[in-house]
């Protein structure tokens, strides 16, 4: 008896949606497979849930699976699952006559420029089949109904027929896509495997692909010879047996066989208990996730339960990628799943920029499937997930720090990220600060933490001292450290460009203020005798300070007697809230710097002179004798320019500085000035350049 076929009209909105999908060009059509596999996974979830209370529900088909069958002969691709299936009314209602609330919203989102890949979020993922197919046939069998076939070419209507003659499914759904002529790539085994791995690798049911295997078999012509024997019986030749064996023709025949190939071999590792997973399994998962050829350095596997549920596995690689801070590169190190379905791998809201090197996956039970980027920015669930991820990452770094060798590797690769964290993450700043490591005046070749520094602080020392500069070599003999070293205070060497930014935010650690050795406001404990001596020297050198200020003009803001320099004649310090010499150097190196900021941030310098230094004492005597003495002015300018260099600044006019040095050399070697008068005619008069700043403005 022929089955009756019923024809139904698509509901108006669904018709509109189909028209949009078919007639608009979308570049990422490949998402259809993700959507259909996701639907299969949902159907399997439903039957698995029903079977918990009634095992007989699985009798018709005990195995839970998803099968993908490409058929090049008919240009069809079938997705088969042993899920819950659909009754006739499910078919009619779900696939065409009742518009889901999401249909209209999805079309509005598409019109507003949203991506077609969001389709599943609106509950209409099935229709993505029409991105690649001109005709779709759905065969389905529910435990409570007979087998039915739904069919449509999306021309405004669909048909539903009771299936009596077709292959019986037992239970489940088979979707057959009759592919468009320009979409036949989806019949290729490699393409399908890549797609399943990309989008559906961690679906919790086995996804098997029907693959074709062609093997070549090489056989001798024995079989053919038997057939020809009768015809050739009369032609007998005396041929050497061995020769005949050699010359016997070989024949290649192709054998074609088909078999199921399991694609999602990687079981969702995050669904298992951490204690059950071996180091090798984590390593294999890490490599499959990141395509890294090395194993990871550390892993954190955890789940959060309660009002919000998600599971995550986070990895720290052994080395930093070459493009770690490439701002043009999309961050795609954390893959976001929702209930085992891959959603996206470049979700910027999931993890802050300073943790961009951490790789892994997050699987949420609460986020809606296929959540859009716009919704992500507002999503409260995601904000909670992000907060937890940051917390767990910091915990992981502390775990790495327990092994000194591992932490050294980690710190070498990712210290800049931690410092960026100090700069950007006010919530976790104090915690991240404990992870910082620096060389210091007392640490030798080892790195020291701020915590260790605090334990070594001298009695009466209230602040943590640091110096910033270009390199350890550049700062370890800096004049700024002389007094601090003499008093036995430890000074941290901050020689990474990003240290300047980090320390700008990290004002203190464990209640101890971080104080720069190169800025104003360095106050060191002094005895009464020291204070008295300082006042006397201040008075004694007051005249020289005025002379130096007159000579240097607006190159310096003021000239004072120093209590930080012990051996050097002088140094140049910057304002407490302005840029250090090192920061000025960094800002000059910025090709696209903001020049408006430089004017007020590159603060005026204060020249601090050392009254105990023999050069300064001699200069004082000469200035007291005659403040217009030409040699005094020349010496002051030379000392200033030398102090610029030793204090970490750059010279605006190195040629003039060189000429001054040469003049001093001549004096030292008693070379008569008249002999070289001609050569000196180009030298600028010392008095004229006194009022002009020779420092390059940082613009």
Curated annotation (Swiss-Prot):
Classification via SUPFAM superfamilies: ATPase domain of HSP90 chaperone/DNA topoisomerase II/histidine kinase, HSP90 C-terminal domain, Ribosomal protein S5 domain 2-like
Gene Ontology terms, MF aspect: ATP binding; ATP hydrolysis activity; ATP-dependent protein folding chaperone; unfolded protein binding
Record's keyword annotation contains Plastid: no
Region (Disordered): 215-250, 672-699
UniProt-listed Pfam families: HATPase_c_3, HSP90
InterPro entries hit by this protein: HATPase_C_sf (IPR036890), Heat_shock_protein_90_CS (IPR019805), HSP90_C (IPR037196), Hsp90_fam (IPR001404), Hsp90_N (IPR020575), Ribosomal_Su5_D2-typ_SF (IPR020568)
Motif (TPR repeat-binding): 695-699
Keywords: ATP-binding, Chaperone, Cytoplasm, Nucleotide-binding, Stress response
Coiled-coil residue windows: none
Biased composition range(s): Acidic residues: 672-690
Localization per Swiss-Prot or TrEMBL: Cytoplasm
Residues that bind ATP: 39, 81, 126, 373
PROSITE patterns per the UniProt record, alphabetical: HSP90 (PS00298)
GO CC annotation, single: cytosol
Main location: cytoplasm
Family: Belongs to the heat shock protein 90 family.
HAMAP family: HSP90
PANTHER family: HEAT SHOCK PROTEIN 90 FAMILY MEMBER
Described purpose of this protein according to its UniProt entry: Molecular chaperone that promotes the maturation, structural maintenance and proper regulation of specific target proteins involved for instance in cell cycle control and signal transduction. Undergoes a functional cycle that is linked to its ATPase activity. This cycle probably induces conformational changes in the client proteins, thereby causing their activation. Interacts dynamically with various co-chaperones that modulate its substrate recognition, ATPase cycle and chaperone function.
Domain observations: The TPR repeat-binding motif mediates interaction with TPR repeat-containing proteins.
Protein name from the UniProt record: Heat shock protein 81-1
Organism: Oryza sativa subsp. japonica (Rice)
Gene assigned in the entry: HSP81-1
